Amino acid sequence: ANSVCFTFTDFESGQQDLIFQGDASVGSNKALQLTKVDSKGNPQGGSVGRALYTAPIRLWQSSSLVASFETTFTFSISQGSSTPAAALTFFIASPDTKIPSGSGGRLLGLFGSSNNAGSDNGVVAVEFDTYPNTDIGDPNYRHIGIDVNSIRSKAASKWDWQNGKTATAHISYNSASKRLSVVSSYPNSSPVVVSFDVELNNVGPPDVRVGFSATTGQYTQTNNILAWSFRSSLMGYQAN
């Protein structure tokens, strides 16, 4: 479709319009639990989960016909261990995307160890990272980053994660300016802003799926999406 619009005010188990991968499920609290928790709600280590909107979305048709989109979601991350880990992402990928082998922990459920810097996986992601891995290029603080076909963020800003609190994220892409922008905040705190210019028609296929991924490692955290809305519109303009 040339334009797509959907809203989830909460989630249901057996949700037909979502594809669940790995450990992702819907909890009794009607939240999208991207990673595994035990019967008491305690997060489990070594978990990878993803959830994608079922219908593919037409992101571009030609270099001069590229979609603009915006998405807003609320989420919460609660630490299970003394240190939380690892991350939650909103991502865009090819319609047949699966969890890559070996993509747990620091690789966000998006990049296998073999292709974490490849240009062929067509992945664009916004990561909310509670555990800096400086050896793979993370800044040495908790951050929100924009990833394009690589685990190494193209742009990142410091993020003051708040344990168990509900955050709001707003991500938009302007196809005329080619700017991907992220604004995220907790109640009563200053928003974190990150942006990066990217030509989405040069990154991945015309049709994509959108959704969320999350991981835990040796250290753990819950990764819950509470509500989600998305809309996109394919508009013609003169691209360079």
Swiss-Prot record:
The keyword Manganese applies. It holds the Pfam family Lectin_legB. Mn(2+) binds at residues 127, 129, 138, 143. The keyword Manganese applies. One of its GO terms (molecular function) is metal ion binding. Transmembrane segments: none annotated. Ca(2+) binds at residues 129, 131, 133, 138. PANTHER family: CONCANAVALIN A-LIKE LECTIN FAMILY PROTEIN (PTHR32401), LEGUME LECTIN DOMAIN-CONTAINING PROTEIN (PTHR32401:SF47). Heterotetramer of two alpha and two beta chains; disulfide bond linked. Binds one manganese (or another transition metal) ion and one calcium ion. The metal ions are essential for the saccharide-binding and cell-agglutinating activities. Belongs to the leguminous lectin family. This is Lectin.
